[in-house]
Each structure stands twice: as C-alpha cells, then as structure tokens.
C-alpha cells in the first residue's frame, strides 16, 4: 500500500481536491487513515449484500473508487445471475479498480465504467452502494440521483449510504470535527497535512446532517431509513424500498 504524503509539504497554491492520478495511487492508505470506521463499513457492506442481493438482479457501486465495496459485496453474494456495476468519474480510479477486481477470481461478473453517476441508468437493482460519494455531488443534484436510485431498485432493495455528517448543534459539531482531526493525527498525519487537506476539500465536499439525509430519503419514497453505523462525524445509513 502506497503511503499518502500528498499534503505533507507546504503547497503554495492549494487548489480544490480532485480524484486524480496522485490521489488514486495512495487512496487505500488515505481513506483508511482518514475515515474512522471505514473497514467496518466495507465489511458490513458484504454482510448487507448477503442479505439483500437477490437472484437475477444488479448491484451498483456508485463512486466505486478502487473497488473495496464492490469486492466486499461480491465475496458475500450467494445468488445466481447477479451482476455488479461499478461507476466512477475518475479515469485513474477506474483503471486501478479494474486491476484490483481482476486480481480476485469470482463467478460474479463486474463491469467498471468511467462515467458521471448522474448520467447512468439504474435498473433491476437489489442493492445500490453510495460509499462517501453523495457528499461530493452539488447539493441541488442529490434528490434527483436518489430518486433515480429509488426508481431503479426492486421492491425490498437496499441503498447503503455512507457519508461524513455535520451536526446542527455547533458545540457537538466542533467536538466531532476535533475528534476526527485527532483520529487523523493518531494515524500519522501532521497538523500541516490535516489543515491543507481540509482547505482542499472545503469547496468540493458539502456535508448534510443525519436528519437531512433521513428526511430526503423518506421523501424520495424509501419505507425504512436508519443510521446503522457512526464513528465521530462519519457514518452509514440503510434505506429499504
């Protein structure tokens, strides 16, 4: 695993965070050391796939990055005639994802596409995964995507939505942000790295509250919506059609 040192030295002109070649190269290390509970979420996606994925259906991993969630789901699917479609708009991520998937043998076919998830059709889905992806979409585009997912899911299909959250209570919000930064420092990131990455993400990652997510998912039509995992200001929800 290549170590993430992208923000370890001062950057004079710090632009917006993008999922380019450099990020794709270090992404597994970056997300492991940056997102509390990431491994637990990836493991549980497999457990949820085992329960929810049905025969003759599709599984979508929207914003699949290097394929961790796709592989976890595939390892746990025991139904026939299932296809997994992974989509990411970063060509470097897609290339590494294809290599990663190809390294593991399975009878379940996986197709990895380089595309904008807003432009991809969702159909005959028993499971859709949005693992730390929705937060990077413009807020005005989120309902349309979730509506498309809901309409493309079969009855009793599941959406797994993992996100960084913000909290309405200012003190709690600041506390959880501070704890997250402490988590990153404990994982070897310096103050400079934490600060520069935070600045780079400011304009591209816009977080919602847990309540905002719940209300939006119910308004779209999901019958059951619940937070199943949280660590500091990161977590994951399930929404069942």
UniProtKB/Swiss-Prot annotation:
**Which enzyme class?**
transferase
Q: What name does UniProt use for this protein?
A: Carboxy-S-adenosyl-L-methionine synthase
Q: Which reaction does it catalyse?
A: prephenate + S-adenosyl-L-methionine = carboxy-S-adenosyl-L-methionine + 3-phenylpyruvate + H2O
Would you identify the family this protein belongs to, as annotated? Answer: Belongs to the class I-like SAM-binding methyltransferase superfamily. Cx-SAM synthase family.
Matching InterPro entries, A to Z? CmoA (IPR005271), Methyltransf_25 (IPR041698), SAM-dependent_MTases_sf (IPR029063)
Q: How does it assemble?
A: Homodimer.
Q: What does this protein do?
A: Catalyzes the conversion of S-adenosyl-L-methionine (SAM) to carboxy-S-adenosyl-L-methionine (Cx-SAM).
- Pfam families cross-referenced by the UniProt entry: Methyltransf_25
GO BP annotation list: tRNA wobble uridine modification
- Key word S-adenosyl-L-methionine present in the record? yes
Q: Which keywords annotate this record?
A: S-adenosyl-L-methionine, Transferase
Residues reported in the UniProt entry to bind S-adenosyl-L-methionine: 38, 63-65, 88-89, 116-117, 131, 198
Family matches, as Gene3D superfamilies: Vaccinia Virus protein VP39 (3.40.50.150)
The protein's matches in HAMAP family, at most eight in alphabetical order, are given as: Cx_SAM_synthase (MF_01589)
Q: GO: which molecular function terms?
A: carboxyl- or carbamoyltransferase activity; S-adenosyl-L-methionine binding
Parts of the chain that traverse the membrane: none
Enzyme Commission code(s) on record: 2.1.3.-
